[in-house]
Amino acid sequence: MIGKHKLELDTPCLVIDKNKLINNIEMMQKFAAAKSKQVRPHAKTHKCVEICQLQLNAGSIGISITKPAEAYELAKAKIRHLLITSPIVTKHKLATLAKILKLAPETMIVVDSEANLAQLNQLGSELNLSINLLVDIDAGIGRTGASFDTAFDLALTVHQHRHTRLKGIQCYAGHFQHILGHDERQQASTALLNKAGQLKQDIEQATGLINLIQSGSGTGTYEIDSDIASVTEIQPGSYTVMDKEYFDIEYNVGHFQSAMTLLTSVISANHSTHVTVDAGTKALYKEATHPQIISQNGENCDDLSYEWHYFGDEHGKVSGGNLPNVGAVIEMIVPHCDPTINLHDKFYVVEDDIVVAVWDIALRGKLA
């Protein structure tokens, strides 16, 4: 594959423009540094060891990840300073966590209940170490996280246990990330994270600990949250490659570039209204937002649309006024990058549209 033009690749496939990727990573890092914030980017988006390493090389303080199986792959690849952002409860996941901590004992984990805290303290005792914990705060999603009413007492208990070490709090508002209007998004996120910051201050005063972490934020609120004094680090993920959902919201600073695109080929053109392509729901995660077609056969176009009418697992429908011929390659920005990436095995990395590397999506399918 190395040396081929991207239009020669078999489809459907994911292509990453390396220069745009690096630009996005460096842009985020410089922005955060100017605001005196750390970046602990979330690898749930790209699921790729090579991209993690680029982020660390650019100055990220560590890597955020959701599942123990994902974290274990990163630890084996010598990616350090991990934050696992979802509670680890089952015996199988706790066994995986034990393996992670043996490779990377500085790893941090979130906790949101007394019951889970007891499990983690017991694991720390068995491993003869103190496990680094952030108290996870429910940001209003109702998904994970302790309530603001219970988080203070939970933090004190973490601090009192012999085999756990309180490092701070996490408050991630995923439901704010795609609020279209910047002002509405800013108002919501600022109110929430200031409330979390007051909680952090109360915990510091009660425990005598200083400089506790306040982690959270995403691609939709990174610029807003970086102006909040109590926030110490941000966890954006999609900024690396971007997607249509994030291009649709209002930012007050410059946009990141569409570093990742999906290529699909026209396989049937027997109708005047549409053509059929080889990317269905097995290649492209279905959202209410449609993909944005940006080119056919390398030529810019704005008159084609990928429609979500039911064309099946293997096929997609492209309509428009200037329909492409059989064999044409369609390039598009995907609606939602995280789950789309999880459908693929590899990234084809290009410079000037020529493949220069093939990177495994090593965390793909690591759901446990």
Question: Which role fits each region the language model picked out?
Answer:
Residues K20-I51, T66:
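N-terminal glycine-rich anion-binding loops that anchor highly charged ligand groups
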Residues K37-Q38, Q205-I213, V326, H344:
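Flexible, glycine/charged-enriched surface loops at secondary-structure junctions
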Residues N270-A368:
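C-terminal accessory subdomain/extension
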